[in-house]
């Protein structure tokens, strides 16, 4: 403020001196300076003085703006830094709420730097979730050491021969957890499932887990089998009950395909596209099976084929070591005649597992792509006949192929033996007449134009 006043006085001094001089010289004015001679009257000189005053005032205003420019720029930078710091703080709180420890610590450090508060990162780190600490049991050596110091030293033992001092070493063998269920437990569970006693089967699983006869993985799979088998039964009094049981089966074992397929088919039949696609994205990392894509195919029939290709390529990237995602992406690329993309995905699938559908698609690419080789197409046709069949519902006990999953195999009555897997060529003779033709041909999600 003082600087502005000094500048204003400097600019106003000539005006004040000129005004005093003009008050002493009324009428015409003559100005002589360094040989220059100017004759004028009072109005003209007053106008000149006014112009000079306006120029000095503008210069004063400009100098004030220039002087305030660094402070304004600094305040603007501080405001931007404060805004970024608050955004990083909110992101750190969101990461803490979602349980993402890595992102939470990164945003907390950024917020502490931008807000110039070193203690903020430590306070936010205390909000992040931490795994529960495992109780550390005292070792045998520590327990023995405590007992040693608790006792008073007694008299020394009498001397004995060295041979008598050697004690036999006894190694205690710890009871290992069973690798799989025993035959008795398997028969007990199978009997309840065959009889349709779903509630009794669930109760028996809980008792077996408490008794230590079942591992958590086996218990989760058997619980999911019982719930999905119960969901497949007709419930005329409660139409929503099968879907509810299927969702419970999914929650019990996320790696079990039948309940996930059950729920996705229900969402597709109701036309709930967003729910079905969300469920597919959550299930695909655990069970990337082609049958899930076949179930969602009605939702994508009217969509752009390029959009479908992008979706399937994203699914293939989620499970890059499973062939079904690459096969579906290759088939979608074949439908829009993107030969390079189709070759890349199909060859990735064939490197993982030889498949008849993949060989057939490669033969068609060689036949339709400009510059393709007829000889290569013939080679792929021969490999198609030599490759394994496409995945199907196969009973692991009797090697029969069935049309749909069931808790009990309709052929051998095996419980929890039907899985979605690739069947070998030799089992074609074991197929029932109704399923032989259907299992040899894989449904196509896309048709080339």
Swiss-Prot record:
Keyword check for Transmembrane helix: yes
Residue ranges of TPR repeats: 323-356
Disruption-associated phenotype: Normal magnetic response, fewer, larger magnetosomes; cells accumulate 20% more iron. Deletion of the 4 gene operon (mms6, mmsF, mms36 and mms48) gives an intermediate magnetic response with fewer, smaller magnetosomes in irregular pseudo-chains.
Stretches that traverse the bilayer: 40-60
Gene Ontology CC: one annotated term: magnetosome membrane
Signal peptide stretch: 1-18
Induction: Part of the probable mms6 operon.
Pfam families in UniProt: HemY_N
Cellular compartment(s): Magnetosome membrane
Membrane-protein topology: Single-pass membrane protein
Keywords: Biomineralization, Magnetosome, Membrane, Signal, TPR repeat, Transmembrane, Transmembrane helix
Additional remarks: This bacteria makes up to 60 cubo-octahedral magnetosomes of about 45 nm in diameter which contain membrane-bound crystals of magnetite (Fe(3)O(4)).
Protein name: Probable magnetosome protein Mms48
UniProt organism field: Magnetospirillum gryphiswaldense (strain DSM 6361 / JCM 21280 / NBRC 15271 / MSR-1)
């Amino acid at each position: 403020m003082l600087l502005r006043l000094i500048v204003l006085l400097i600019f106003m001094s000539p005006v004040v001196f000129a005004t005093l001089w003009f008050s002493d010289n009324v009428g015409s004015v003559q100005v002589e300076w360094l040989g220059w001679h100017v004759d004028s009257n009072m109005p003209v000189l007053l106008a000149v003085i006014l112009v000079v005053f306006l120029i000095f005032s503008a210069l004063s205003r400009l100098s004030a703006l220039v002087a305030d420019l660094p402070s304004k720029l600094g305040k603007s930078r501080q405001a931007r830094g404060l805004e970024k710091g608050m955004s990083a703080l909110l992101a750190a709180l969101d990461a803490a709420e979602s349980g993402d420890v890595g992102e939470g610590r990164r945003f907390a450090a950024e917020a502490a730097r931008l807000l110039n508060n070193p203690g903020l990162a430590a306070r936010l780190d205390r909000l992040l979730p931490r795994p529960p600490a495992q109780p550390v049991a005292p070792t045998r050596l520590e327990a023995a050491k405590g007992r040693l110091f608790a006792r008073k030293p007694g008299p020394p033992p009498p001397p004995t021969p060295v041979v008598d001092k050697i004690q036999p070493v006894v190694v205690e063998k710890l009871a290992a957890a069973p690798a799989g269920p025993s035959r008795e437990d398997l028969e007990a569970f199978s009997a309840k499932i065959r009889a349709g006693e779903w509630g009794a089967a669930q109760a028996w699983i809980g008792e077996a887990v408490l008794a230590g006869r079942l591992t958590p993985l086996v218990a989760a799979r058997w619980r999911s089998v019982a719930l999905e088998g119960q969901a497949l039964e007709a419930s005329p009094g409660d139409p929503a009950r099968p879907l509810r049981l299927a969702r419970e089966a999914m929650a019990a074992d996320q790696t079990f395909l039948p309940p996930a397929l059950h729920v996705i088919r229900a969402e597709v039949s109701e036309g709930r596209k967003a729910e079905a696609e969300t469920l597919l994205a959550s299930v695909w990392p655990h069970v990337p099976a082609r049958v899930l894509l076949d179930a969602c195919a009605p939702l994508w029939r009217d969509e752009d084929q390029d959009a479908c290709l992008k979706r399937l390529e994203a699914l293939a990237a989620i499970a890059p070591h499973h062939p079904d995602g690459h096969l579906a992406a290759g088939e979608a690329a074949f439908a829009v005649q993107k030969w390079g993309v189709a070759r890349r995905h199909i060859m990735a699938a064939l490197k993982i597992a030889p498949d008849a559908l993949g060989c057939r698609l490669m033969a068609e690419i060689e036949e339709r792509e400009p510059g393709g080789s007829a000889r290569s197409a013939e080679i792929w046709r021969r490999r198609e006949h030599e490759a394994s069949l496409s995945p199907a519902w196969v009973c692991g006990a009797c090697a029969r192929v069935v049309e749909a999953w069931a808790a009990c195999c309709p052929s051998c009555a095996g419980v929890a033996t039907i899985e979605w897997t690739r069947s070998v060529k030799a089992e074609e003779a074991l197929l029932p007449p109704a399923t032989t033709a259907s299992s040899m041909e894989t449904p196509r999600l896309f048709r080339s134009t």
